[in-house]
Design a protein with these regions (language model features):
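Generic, well-ordered alpha-helical segments
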Residues: 31, 35-43, 51-60, 64, ...
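Short alpha-helical packing/oligomerization segments
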Residues: 162-182
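Hydrophobic core segments of alpha-helical transmembrane domains in multi-pass membrane proteins
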Residues: 3-12, 55-67, 117-124, 175-185
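Interhelical loop and helix-boundary elements at the membrane-water interface
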Residues: 12-38, 69-168, 187-204
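Helix-coil boundary and interhelical linker segments in multi-pass alpha-helical membrane proteins
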Residues: 1-5, 45-59, 101-118, 169-175
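Short hydrophobic alpha-helical segments that form membrane-spanning helices or hydrophobic packing faces
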Residues: 22-23, 44, 102, 178-183
């Protein structure tokens, strides 16, 4: 369990946090950016493998499989743009399955407890991966385009909100979550009135 959690944490860091917007965008063209992403993605695993002196063959499997899966995902996205959200979820599932298989061959001594690793993983997933998933879902449902400035502001606010709600859940402060939702609704009341159907659909 320790191994799998640690490997998934490194996967999330490499696939989402070490990938810049420029690399993510240009990856769609199947050019050198795809290779750049795979190399950068492998950095956390390289450090792990050096520290624990693990067989390098597993590192090669993780890196090459990641590159191959990403290439297939990009080709599918270019062909089936309306199914981008489903392809993203399938892509991540296969990545994690490969990582699970590789991690099962190792027995690492890790100081952190399972709960600590789960908490770290939960926060990491709640920020960028969840943001990407929500963005893809809205892209399918709502066809209009937003400015980069508006998207970035909304994205960062979403990051902060999810982290705050997660921490409040950990500290068993459920009532505060209700207060945050009520306060946000009050602040956005004007938007709800001005664009009733559209805004309410997104809010729900």
């Amino acid at each position: 369990m320790h191994n799998m959690l640690l490997f998934i944490i490194f996967h999330v860091v490499g696939d989402f946090y070490l990938q810049s917007d420029e690399v993510a965008k240009n990856k769609e063209n199947l050019n050198t950016f795809m290779l750049i992403h795979s190399i950068i993605y492998s950095i956390p695993f390289v450090l792990l493998f050096i520290y624990f002196k693990i067989n390098v063959s597993l590192l090669i499997i993780i890196t090459l499989s990641h590159l191959l899966i990403d290439v297939c995902s990009v080709k599918l996205k270019n062909k089936y743009k309306e199914k981008e959200c489903l392809i993203f979820c399938s892509d991540q599932f296969i990545h994690i399955f490969i990582i699970y298989l590789c991690s099962s061959y190792m027995n690492l001594t890790i100081i952190l407890s399972n709960m600590a690793l789960i908490s770290i993983l939960a926060i990491l997933i709640l920020v960028k991966p969840t943001g990407v998933l929500i963005s893809l879902a809205f892209k399918v449902i709502f066809k209009e385009e937003k400015s980069n400035h508006e998207l970035k502001i909304g994205t960062y606010i979403g990051y902060l909100e999810r982290i705050i709600i997660f921490l409040l859940c950990i500290f068993d402060s459920i009532s505060t979550i209700g207060f945050i939702i009520a306060a946000k609704t009050l602040v956005r009341y004007k938007d709800i009135n001005n664009n009733k159907n559209h805004f309410q659909e997104k809010g729900l």
